[in-house]
């Protein structure tokens, strides 16, 4: 029997009605009240997520920048202390090792935040390519992460923070902020398509912080949220999920995150030749939005057809809680990727009519 890993908040889930599932070897809450209710709370008020299963790796040393420039696709040299950057790590063939966030805490001090299912693989990949005076340390077990997301997130978090949160702009952070007396790194980032913050603290402080935030946010409608709503929210915002929109067989260009690939940076990073070619001349496949016109919900790996030709497959799909439509993301042959192209999705051995639509499906009004 496989023992599932648990976050420092596991013992608190039951108090709030959390229903747990096995998520990539982690016992995590899929929902507390209902996915629809939690999704709605984040779009209209605020939601609190336990994201402590995510991995954290510290990269330090004189050669830390040179090392990161070699292993990630974005240009880390443009990052200033107090800034965050979204990027990817790729194999030499351009396939994706992982997508991640890099926080620059000091001139020779970076924190990498990686996907939970990839912690060991990513750490080994990084450690095996270290150059010069750079150190790579996996600190995942020492760090917990909470995400407070939604239009009311700032107001709620402000109640327990003395610094003015308005000063933390999008993709910026402050280190060593006291959140209700607990030292934390607070960044204006998220995975929902809404405004919000991700809070990194010591594992032993996570439960106290979780309870305090839910207490001070209750009157504004802050709800504890699970993986179900996290997935429907990120999907509507067209934010990729590793293992679905990204994988060792899918490049960042194909997945629509070409903005995080800088082939013109000086460093010869892994996958550079392939990604440069795809960025300049186009990739053979493209991630597109699809709306199902007939009955049926597109799910991961469902094949997409035009006539008898299979042109790709669905990577993610659901009945969108915000749009009340059956929509999906699909990786398809680029020659059929134009908006309004009519396609068919095979749902339970039956072909269902669908159409290519623009993405993101949802974009918050500023």
Swiss-Prot record:
Reaction it catalyzes: N(6)-[(R)-S(8)-aminomethyldihydrolipoyl]-L-lysyl-[protein] + (6S)-5,6,7,8-tetrahydrofolate = N(6)-[(R)-dihydrolipoyl]-L-lysyl-[protein] + (6R)-5,10-methylene-5,6,7,8-tetrahydrofolate + NH4(+)
GO MF assignments: aminomethyltransferase activity; transaminase activity
Disulphide connectivity of cysteines: none
GO biological process: glycine decarboxylation via glycine cleavage system
GO CC list: cytosol; glycine cleavage complex
Keyword Signal listed: no
A Pfam family assignment: GCV_T
SUPFAM superfamilies: Aminomethyltransferase beta-barrel domain, Folate-binding domain
This protein's UniProt keywords: Aminotransferase, Transferase
EC number(s) recorded for this UniProt protein: 2.1.2.10
Protein family membership: Belongs to the GcvT family.
Alphabetical list of PANTHER family matching this protein: AMINOMETHYLTRANSFERASE, AMINOMETHYLTRANSFERASE, MITOCHONDRIAL
NCBIfam families cross-referenced by the UniProt entry: gcvT, PRK00389.1
Entry function: The glycine cleavage system catalyzes the degradation of glycine.
Name by which UniProt lists this protein: Aminomethyltransferase
Species of origin: Bacillus cereus (strain ZK / E33L)
Lineage of the organism: Bacteria, Bacillati, Bacillota, Bacilli, Bacillales
Gene giving rise to this polypeptide: gcvT
């Amino acid at each position: 029997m496989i023992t599932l890993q648990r976050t420092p908040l596991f013992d608190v889930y039951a108090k709030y009605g959390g229903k747990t599932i096995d998520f990539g070897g982690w016992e995590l809450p899929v929902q507390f009240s209902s996915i629809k209710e939690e999704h709605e709370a984040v779009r209209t008020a605020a939601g609190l997520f336990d994201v402590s299963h995510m991995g954290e790796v510290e990269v330090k040393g004189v050669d830390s920048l040179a090392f990161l420039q070699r292993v990630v696709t974005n240009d880390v040299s443009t990052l200033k202390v107090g800034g965050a950057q979204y990027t990817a790590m790729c194999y030499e063939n351009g396939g994706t090792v992982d997508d991640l966030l890099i926080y620059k805490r000091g001139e020779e001090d970076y924190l990498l935040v990686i996907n939970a299912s990839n912690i060991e693989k990513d750490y080994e990949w990084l450690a095996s390519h270290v150059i010069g005076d750079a150190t790579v340390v996996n600190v995942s077990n020492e760090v917990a992460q909470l995400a407070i997301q939604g239009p009311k997130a700032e107001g709620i978090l402000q109640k327990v923070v003395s610094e003015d949160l308005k000063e933390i702009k999008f993709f910026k952070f402050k280190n060593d902020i006291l959140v209700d007396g607990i030292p934390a790194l607070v960044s204006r980032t998220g995975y929902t398509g809404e405004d919000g913050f991700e809070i990194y603290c010591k594992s032993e402080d996570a439960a106290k912080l979780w309870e305090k935030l839910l207490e001070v946010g209750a009157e504004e409608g802050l709800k504890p949220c699970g993986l179900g709503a996290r997935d429907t929210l990120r999907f509507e915002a067209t934010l990729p999920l590793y293992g679905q929109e990204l994988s060792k067989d899918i490049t960042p260009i194909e997945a629509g995150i070409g903005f995080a690939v800088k082939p013109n940076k000086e460093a010869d990073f892994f996958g550079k030749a392939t990604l440069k070619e795809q960025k300049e001349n186009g990739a053979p496949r493209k991630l597109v939005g699809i709306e199902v016109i007939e009955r049926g919900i597109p799910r991961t790996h469902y094949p997409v057809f035009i006539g008898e030709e299979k042109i790709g497959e669905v990577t993610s799909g659901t009945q969108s809680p915000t749009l009340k439509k059956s929509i999906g993301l699909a990786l398809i042959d680029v020659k059929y990727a134009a908006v309004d192209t009519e396609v068919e999705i095979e749902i339970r051995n039956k072909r269902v009519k669908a159409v290519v639509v623009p993405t993101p499906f949802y974009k918050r009004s500023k």
